[in-house]
Amino acid sequence: MKRLTFDGCAGWLHEAAGKAATTGVVLCAPHMHEAMWTHRGMRHLADDLAAAGVPVLRFDYYGTGDSAGDGGEPDFVPRAVQSVVTAAARLRALTGVQDVVLCGMRLGATLAVLASEAMAVDAGGAPAALVLMAPVVNGRAYLRELRALGAFYAPEDADGRTDAAQPAVADDNGLEILSYRLAPQAMQEIGSLRLDRRPGTPARRVLLLDDVPGSASAVASLAQHYQQAGAHVDVVDFHDSRLLMKSPEVSAVPETSWRRIVEWLAPDAAAKAAPPQPAEDADTAFEVDGVVEHSVWIDNGRQFGVLCVPDGETPPAIVVFPNTGGSHHVGDGRAFVLLSRALARRGFAALRLDVSTLGDSPGAAREMAVPRAYAPGPRADVSAAVDWLRARGYSHIVMAGVCSGAYLSLQAALANEHVTGVVMANALKYLWRDEDDAAHHSGPERLRDYLHAARDARNWQRLMRGEFPLRKIVAGAAQAARGAARKLAVGGHSRQAGKSGETVDAEQEYARGAMTRLSRHRVQLDLLYGVDDAGLALAGRCFGDDFSHLHDLPCISAHRCAQLDHAMILGPSRDTFLAFLMQNLRRQLVIADAASVQAAAGEPAATATAAG
């Protein structure tokens, strides 16, 4: 697994185990939120193929993931198609394979078809086969799904009602879903696509994975179209796609489907070998959007990260973004990529971190559950990353986390004396214990089903066929999600008997003690909550509704923010978070400068005073 870049795109080469390969695969990821949801599955599909002797190149399209660009570029479709073509050529050059297979999912499958047609223009350049997983056959239907999902995440009014009839953004301004944007031009190009009406077949062999098999299946229609054009087509059910197409903190690899793909591409492969371990190249510098990014392996190669630094400057401080839930290092809505580069352009460094069980780290798990985000392992991983940064000369290290990442940031500051600042947003827990695991798993099945359904893009196809009403889904799933978050934050199982028999709120006691300790050690900490965030119930329980128990702690500040959604996926929320990061960094540097002046003058260091 080697890092590579081309044409502004960042990607990975998964080298094949065993003898020299003759066939390689280019993975074409879905787009927007679906790329985040499926990252775990796509990364492990690449690992599985490499272990079976098939090298794989996977990458982020321009404007997505770790690649260059802000996102929402008008020319997304033609640029992405050209990137797939370039990736195929790069795979051939790097591995010596003769045949290339394009393997795509959802819109990525559609882009693979378009790229295959473009490659066929060059003699000998056409792909040997296509693997199309739940392809977007009808672009207009795909856009309707996106609008429906946007309606689900539409803002609530003061009474908690959601206007499900309104799309997130009008079509003449493009479409924004969970902070991922489609420009009007890209929408027009996608809306005009009908794979089952394009002439001919894009490859001689095609494997289709159908996630909604039945009489109305668009994939079945596409299979018939390709067969009539002379292709050999295999169609298999993709029932386990629901394991993949959901929020990363609860998603898993669709093992059955991945085995089918590996067997189809490498039927003569020997018993599955372990995929090769990642190799750190001597020079991983990637000049992107006015900054420089380095791929780094931390903690004896157990963790992967992207170190983002100013171009030509020595940064005085660094911000560390740990994973949120099960998302990989780019962050929900690509937030950590955009924040990292914004910080670097302002003269600071940033590290986007994958703990050892997530993202692109070598030992990333094949499934995820919420309690794992709070487990001892990730806490130790983050502290090890802090040690790695300190060993490289960073004296000001700020942890910056969202939701479970806020918890990891707090724990890192408590465990590691090298942490000098913390900005934590919308924390739902300050203390995680065994009983919290039990509480998470004991919730009603209907609640978990609603949460999964709300995040499952495939359900929107059923909605478009009128199988269930949008308003009922919106109201039920939104209410369930709020209830689940409040239950986690309130933590009703965290009370215990004190020495004298009185009832003690263990999490309250822990949180207050943690803040007191950090303030004593002069760690600058900003505690942020959105004005309606479910985590405010926890904050009120631990610190008082007005944060009164924090008022006498000079280094601790608490804030209710009008523009801060829970997962920090919206643009205004990122702006709010960035503003507090800059305040925290500048506050540290001012204090450090004052201490340096005092030290030079032989004066004792000043005692910290309460923040206003």
Task: Locate predicted features.
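Alpha/beta-hydrolase active-site loop
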Residues: 41, 73-94, 368-392
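Short, surface-exposed "cap/lid" segments of acyl-processing enzymes
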Residues: 16-60, 310-354
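Glycine-rich "HGGG/HGxG" loop immediately N-terminal to the catalytic nucleophile
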Residues: 60-75, 353-370
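Conserved hydrolase catalytic core segment
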Residues: 114-129, 407, 411-421
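The alpha/beta-hydrolase serine catalytic core
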Residues: 125-258, 262, 418-578
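Gly/Ala-rich beta-loop-alpha elbow adjacent to hydrolase catalytic centers
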Residues: 103-113, 134, 400-409
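N-terminal cap/lid segment of alpha/beta-hydrolase-fold proteins
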Residues: 1-23, 263, 267-314, 570
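Catalytic active-site module of serine/aspartate enzymes centered on a nucleophile-bearing elbow/loop
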Residues: 243, 248-289, 562-612
